[in-house]
From Swiss-Prot:
<comment type="similarity">
    <text>Belongs to the TACO1 family. YeeN subfamily.</text>
</comment>
<dbReference type="InterPro" id="IPR049083">
    <property type="entry name" value="TACO1_YebC_N"/>
</dbReference>
<dbReference type="Pfam" id="PF20772">
    <property type="entry name" value="TACO1_YebC_N"/>
</dbReference>
<dbReference type="GO" id="GO:0006355">
    <property type="term" value="P:regulation of DNA-templated transcription"/>
</dbReference>
<keyword id="KW-0963">Cytoplasm</keyword>
<dbReference type="InterPro" id="IPR048300">
    <property type="entry name" value="TACO1_YebC-like_2nd/3rd_dom"/>
</dbReference>
<keyword id="KW-0805">Transcription regulation</keyword>
<keyword id="KW-0804">Transcription</keyword>
<keyword id="KW-0238">DNA-binding</keyword>
<dbReference type="Pfam" id="PF01709">
    <property type="entry name" value="Transcrip_reg"/>
</dbReference>
<protein>
    <recommendedName>
        <fullName>Probable transcriptional regulatory protein YeeN</fullName>
    </recommendedName>
</protein>
<dbReference type="InterPro" id="IPR029072">
    <property type="entry name" value="YebC-like"/>
</dbReference>
<dbReference type="InterPro" id="IPR002876">
    <property type="entry name" value="Transcrip_reg_TACO1-like"/>
</dbReference>
<dbReference type="InterPro" id="IPR017856">
    <property type="entry name" value="Integrase-like_N"/>
</dbReference>
<dbReference type="GO" id="GO:0005829">
    <property type="term" value="C:cytosol"/>
</dbReference>
<dbReference type="GO" id="GO:0003677">
    <property type="term" value="F:DNA binding"/>
</dbReference>
<dbReference type="InterPro" id="IPR026562">
    <property type="entry name" value="Transcrip_reg_TACO1_YeeN"/>
</dbReference>
Amino acid sequence: MGRKWANIVAKKTAKDGATSKVYAKFGVEIYAAAKQGEPDPESNSALKFVIERAKQAQVPKHVIDKAIDKAKGGGDETFVQGRYEGFGPNGSMVIAETLTSNVNRTIANIRTIFNKKGGNIGAAGAVSYMFDNTGVIVFKGTDPDHIFEILLDAEVDVRDVTEEEGNIVIYTEATDLHKGIAALKAAGITEFSTTELEMIAQSEVELSPEDLEIFEGLVDALEDDDDVQKVYHNVANL
């Protein structure tokens, strides 16, 4: 899974570079999680998980606090999750996950992006069956065998544990991500660089320079949309 890990890192690094976009999108996600439950991370596990991910992305405390305070203050916006799937050139596939207060606006924007950027939007499920919903946990370390034993003892459903460039990279069944994190914390591991649910392509394609330019434009436009939280694809050389 080394290539998959490299793609996740590349995507995360690219998105982290656009700091204002990252902060705004985490602000929305934190607000939505706080509104759906208690605005206290100690009693709202979904909110706690989002805050942990925001800290991994170096979102400042004041951005996190502002989103929680907005939820506490009775903000009346309601956000709905969505997923849009489609195709780029030569077997390329893309999934955009959204969080929006205006579904009609989001649908219109996503359709426009696909139409203008050389893609074709598909029906629900058109490409997601070619991706595996996977828990990904990353932290500094060099002994994957020891980590695998910890997870095995905790009965975590693990797909793979590898060492990549001084990092332990764990892939779990999506339903066992939080169980895996808890097992690692119980073993004394508390600093994580990534704890995410990722849609990982079962197989990847490589695009020609011309097709890659088109596909990159599609992915960039989707990621730039304010309502899009995450974008997944199956292109190995992007």
